[in-house]
Amino acid sequence: MADWNAEQYLKFEDERTRPARDLLAQVPTTAPRKVADIGCGPGNSTALLVERWPEASVIGVDTSADMLRQARERLPQHKFIEANVAHWAPPAGTDVLFANAVFQWVPDHLKQLRRLLSGLDSGGVLAVQMPDNLDEPSHIMMREVALQEPWRHQLSKAAELRDTLPKPSVYYDALKPLCSRLEIWHTVYNHALDGPEAIVEWVKGTGLRPFIDPLELPERKTYLAAYTARIAAAYPAQADGQVLLRFPRIFIVAVK
């Protein structure tokens, strides 16, 4: 995919940050020395970590140059690293590994979660949140439109960039032997948005990118028009004209 677009991502900053707040609220650590924000994006989640633990050394890690530019502007006093989590190791003595909406994009992410959890000292925390929405209409419609002409050839591999998440029982069996405490839960958010076009704008910043990035501008416009029409049918307006975007997410908090 092309580089992430921080401006597009931040169009729904409040809604995207809420799961990070909910995840952070369940992290039991009171006074960590070192904290790492994996997949820090534009720094919205990193800011929460800095706010909660102002005395800690907080670093952010991301693969996107544009996201890191925004994060550095937001938090110039903190360190941000461009790195792929699959090849990155946290600094020795890191107490909290925080990952908001990143591991769904990481191939074989369960292996990576085990690796990171194994490297923590006793009492260290791995806190993870991932969208679990591939079976929602917002994402089903992406794949359905991509199978149609004239996009079928260019987008045949788009859906392969993100796998369906394992069941909670799979995460439990993989992670529990490595930690003293493990909490796993789902939360379903219902975001009130201004209409089907707002849903499209939301997913253009994340899940829709593998489907539109490969397309030239004319093909992208026709794809988005077809996709928007399906979204309008799948998400009817409420009494006040808003639409509700149902958004399930899985949360994992593991204490070493």
UniProtKB/Swiss-Prot annotation:
EC number(s) reported in the record: 2.1.1.144
GO biological process: methylation
Subcellular location, principal: cytoplasm
Subcellular location: Cytoplasm
Alphabetical list of Pfam families matching this protein: Methyltransf_25
InterPro entries, A to Z: Methyltransf_25, SAM-dependent_MTases_sf, Trans-aconitate_MeTrfase, Trans_acon_MeTrfase_C
Record Gene3D superfamilies: S-adenosyl-L-methionine-dependent methyltransferases, Vaccinia Virus protein VP39
Keywords carried by this UniProt record: Cytoplasm, Methyltransferase, S-adenosyl-L-methionine, Transferase
Superkingdom to which the source organism belongs: Bacteria
GO cellular component: cytoplasm
Listed GO MF terms: trans-aconitate 2-methyltransferase activity
Top enzyme category: transferase
Catalyzed reaction equations: trans-aconitate + S-adenosyl-L-methionine = (E)-3-(methoxycarbonyl)pent-2-enedioate + S-adenosyl-L-homocysteine
Similarity annotation: Belongs to the methyltransferase superfamily. Tam family.
Function: Catalyzes the S-adenosylmethionine monomethyl esterification of trans-aconitate.
Protein name per the record: Trans-aconitate 2-methyltransferase
